[in-house]
Amino acid sequence: MKQIYYVIQALIHGRGANIIKVVSLGLGLTMSILLFSRVVYEQSFDTCFKDHDKLYQLWNIWTVNGEPFPPSEFIIGAAAGGILDAMPEIVESAASTGSWPVSAPIYNGSVRFDDFKVTADSLFFQTMGIEVLSGDPVRELQQKDVIFLSKDLADKMFGGENPIGKIISFNKEIELTVKGTYAALPENCTMRPKAVISLPSIWSRRIGNYSWNGGDSWKEYIRLKQDIDLDELNKRIDMVVQQHIPRSDKLGITVMAKPVRDTYRGYDEVKRMRNIMLILGISILFITTLNYVLISISSLSRRAKSIGVHKCSGAGTGTVFGMFMWETGIIILLSLFLMVFLMFNFREFVEDTTAAKLESLFAVERIWVPLGVTAVLFLIGGVLPGRIFSKIPVTQVFRRYTEGKKGWKRPLLFIQFAGVAFICGLMWVVMLQYHYVINKDPGYNPERVVIGVNNAPDAKARLAARHFYEGLPYVEALTSATSYPSNGYSGQMIPDEKGTSLFSSRYDFTQENYVAFMGMVIQQGRVPRESGEVAVNEEFVRRMHWGKDVLGKSIQTEEGRVKIVGVIKDFNIDGFYSELKPFVLHHHPRDLADLVYLRLKEPFGENLQKLKRDAAEAFPNQTVGFESLEQKMADSYNSVRVFRNATLLAAIAILFITLMGLIGYINDELQRRSKEIAIRKVNGAESFVILEMLVQDVLWISFPAVVAGTLGAWYVGGLWMEQFAVTVGSLVPYYVCVAIVVLILIVSCVISKTWRIANENPVKSIKSE
């Protein structure tokens, strides 16, 4: 107990330095634990399903003229069922699901619910390994107009009432009967529906292509009875598929299975961000730990005498070591309290930055992450200084202790300076790229444009809806289409004159005024005005190798043979993650297509709210909702925004931590060299000379460290930039500027801390010796 008493007294006596330790450790622990927890959380995706190691997802690989396309998790509808029928000795069950046919909201009375839903067959729950709480899905999901609700959605819709037998509405068009409930799924799974609608509900209305011939828009899964070599499994699956798909010399398809757990963590962007977050987490933890070591060891000269007193009183090496470990433990505990305070007081921001709820990040099965990070900090941050302190000889009680060797301090400072340059450089590049893609001209004008779904059931209702929207005083213009650019559009294969598939092109059906409404540019010809006419973009022309002679040519599409009457200037499709894509613009003959486009007058936000209210009153029996196109575009870069926030927080934390370590180093140097400085001044050295000497001492460490850190930022920033088709340009000037700013901050910190002693009377320093 005496050890703890002396430790507490030492902490109180040095409370100024200890507050700095607590704050720097608290910030470092917060950032590193959040980063490591996020990495582990992402690696745990899809482990919530029962016996997840037996659950596999099916993937498509299309081949055009022998050239394979990247694997796609959206596959042809009949594949899963066909594999189950052909391989009953291996496959226990199979399921087909689709979210696009049931993307509209469901209603309980007049209350709208936009929760994620899928349509699925009767073996969905058995295949996925999801616990069914009530109902018989194998029997009920074979019927049309049936829905199963997750427990949390059922509670939200009906409170404590039994939902079985309740009638709800899909899109105010189809009445669905609730036939069962199932356990809610955690956030970390790729298939997490809040409601499951029976697949016959879709089939009976002839929605979608559910066959062996195209229609690759379904997510499908199989559950195995027994372990089997993955290569052998995929070989047998491919044999089944080849027996059923239509024969084609030009177009081929391969279906393969992958463990469901590899789906999320196999995405390129997830693997890229995992590596970057690991680097950031390790950097911050390493720098935080070494900063604590640096601050602790820098207090050696101040604390040597008290340790000598303890040893004179009978304390051995182990006792002194134990006292320092107790001190480290208490400081880390206080830092953890600060971390918890920060996380819960800034919970919304933290959850937005990590893209996960705190209770998910720190679930019981992942609590080892913060414990492990804390243990690493305690062992390195406690053992290294503790051993140095415990070896101080008892003779230090009789004389002033000055540690003349700087070998152990310089590497610590080097690592911290390199870490600051690395994280600040990466942060600046991420911020520049985010600003660039958000503000770059996409080739059309989304300003004040809103998009809503047209649910008018017939031509008369469509015409009435058009007149209603055009008559609103705050609507500037109206047009219509079946999709929108940032959504990526659907695709179709474009063949040559011999029927050989050349490439996949995006396409849309729009009204005649669509191009002018969107601010797109016609390079040649005009817009389509009737069926059988199309306009193509410049990239389409390049893919066809037509040169400038384009107008009047015809191409084969899924709509038949069509004539090209115009060429549109290239515009961005599917965000700046993708290269330019070929595009075909068809004419839509009806008054309104699937989507209604409106350009509103200012004030935009106020008029959008008026539009939602007026449309809901005008069409009470339809699902009506409008969203800003600019907001949809911004949402597509949400992961970039989140990473920008994370790097900004990391940069602020690491800059504060490093400056605290630098201040500790400077204080120790000033105390160690105070007599030398005084003698130099007595011998005629000016204040500027003293400052120059101390600044050069730090620059010998900081300059190569900042160069190394900047090179690291350049490498990691390059990895992160790989996800974009367009980038901000040459980043070298920005990296150089960041390096210079970091060096200026370091030099400014040195000058501010040494200014007083460089200008004080040297007699005071000599007297204190």
Where are these regions (language model features)?
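Hydrophobic alpha-helical transmembrane segments of multi-pass inner-membrane transport and secretion
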Residues: H13-V40, V270-K305, L333, W408-Q433, ...
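Hydrophobic alpha-helical bundles that form the membrane domains of multi-pass transporters
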Residues: D268-R347, D352, W368
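Membrane-helix entry/capping segments
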Residues: K2-I4, Q9-A17, F49, R236-S283, ...
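Membrane-proximal extracellular/periplasmic loop immediately following the first transmembrane helix
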Residues: L35-S103, N213-R223, D231-R236, M256-D262, ...
